[in-house]
Regions:
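An aromatic- and glycine-enriched ligand-binding surface/loop that stacks and positions planar moieties
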Residues: 1-18, 97, 154, 165-317, ...
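Short, small-residue-rich loop/turn micro-motifs
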Residues: 101-106, 132, 167-169
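TPR/Sel1-like alpha-solenoid repeat signature
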Residues: 80, 157-163
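Short, conserved phosphate-binding/catalytic loop or strand-edge motifs used
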Residues: 102-108, 180-183
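Conserved, well-structured interaction surfaces
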Residues: 17-94, 111-148
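Short, flexible loop/turn elements at secondary-structure junctions
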Residues: 103-106, 143, 285-289
Length: 324
């Protein structure tokens, strides 16, 4: 769970689902920075700040004498992952963006000397993909509970898979509207978005997805069937209706006969399962961090007259109120 609002680096998508500024968003009353520093469009500045910090780190970490070689290697992997992630957030929001030199920029120079043009979308994808390969080669395969928020090899390969899937999709693979392709041309006449379809991009994306699958580390979380305990926190499993086939009579993973399908889904969102215990998580910011954690989100879903709920656009519907 991320938040009841987006953050600049939401791990899901770029949809805005906050409650307090819905009218402004719907009416288009926002700038290129979004509706404030807590919203999904406020990405440009923090992303490039992060890229600069990460480049400085990568260019200087080898001078450190306090950390061991394995520790330095892992930190380098994290830095390559995060630099790729920052660029991913940028191209997801703005399309082709400038790729800055890995050695960094001398900000004491005049603006014209350090103003870099936009790279093409394919160039951005290639850079991000290469960064994630470097990260995957250095990162650990798994993290302990105290380091659950740090990226792993699976996180790097998964992000690479998503980036390459987007690159293969029609909008970025020669199928964008002609007026969009024509508009994405820099001052030198360089096309920033390809107008040529390339079937190979799908093969590359499929191979990247296979790299993740072959790790064998991720699977759906399931809660097993219960006859019910002595407390309300352990209710008996509500048996789903029979399907037309044999799924209802087969044990997991070929059916739901021995699991609780509803609880398997519910437990992922009500705080019952920790980030460390969730076998579906690939990259996470942790469990219940910040002021807008699961407890607060639940309160926002309650009616104001029931249990001290807050004003929110995600309140339960009126017919459901008697259940509270």
């Amino acid at each position: 769970v991320n938040s009841k609002k987006n953050t600049s680096f939401n791990f899901a998508d770029d949809m805005y689902y906050g409650d307090s500024n819905y009218v402004d968003w719907k009416s288009g009353n926002y700038t290129e920075k979004g509706l404030g520093t807590g919203n999904s469009l406020y990405i440009w500045q923090p992303a490039y700040q992060g890229i600069r910090h990460l480049s400085v780190f990568l260019n200087n970490i080898d001078m450190n004498k306090e950390f061991s070689e394995p520790e330095i290697a892992d930190m380098k992997g994290q830095a390559h992952f995060l630099r790729a992630y920052c660029y991913w957030m940028l191209i997801r929001s703005f399309g082709p963006v400038p790729i800055l030199p890995d050695e960094g920029i001398d900000y004491t120079k005049e603006y014209d000397e350090i103003a870099y043009p936009r790279n093409s979308y394919d160039e951005c994808v290639d850079y991000i993909s290469n960064e994630l390969v470097k990260a995957a080669m250095l990162l650990e395969e798994a993290r302990g509970p105290q380091d659950i928020v740090r990226p792993t090899r699976g996180a790097a390969l998964s992000l690479r898979s998503r980036v390459l899937l987007y690159a293969a999709s029609p909008l970025f693979n020669g199928k964008a509207p002609a007026e969009v392709i024509a508009a994405l041309v820099d001052k030198s006449g360089k096309k920033l978005l390809s107008d040529t379809y390339d079937e190979r991009k799908w093969a590359i994306a499929a191979a990247a997805a296979k790299d993740v699958i072959e790790l064998g580390k991720y699977q759906l979380y399931v809660a097993y069937k219960s006859e019910g305990g002595s407390s309300l926190s352990d209710p008996a499993t509500i048996t789903p209706p029979d399907d037309e086939g044999t799924f209802h009579s087969n044990p997991w993973p070929k059916g739901w006969q021995n699991i609780d399908p509803f609880k398997s889904y519910r437990a992922l969102f009500d705080g019952e399962v920790s980030a460390y215990g969730n076998s579906e998580i690939i990259f996470t910011r942790g469990t219940n961090q910040g002021a807008e954690n699961i407890k607060v989100m639940v309160i926002h879903q309650l009616p104001r007259s029931q249990g001290g709920g807050y004003l929110s656009l995600i309140h339960i519907s009126e017919p459901t109120r008697p259940l509270y």
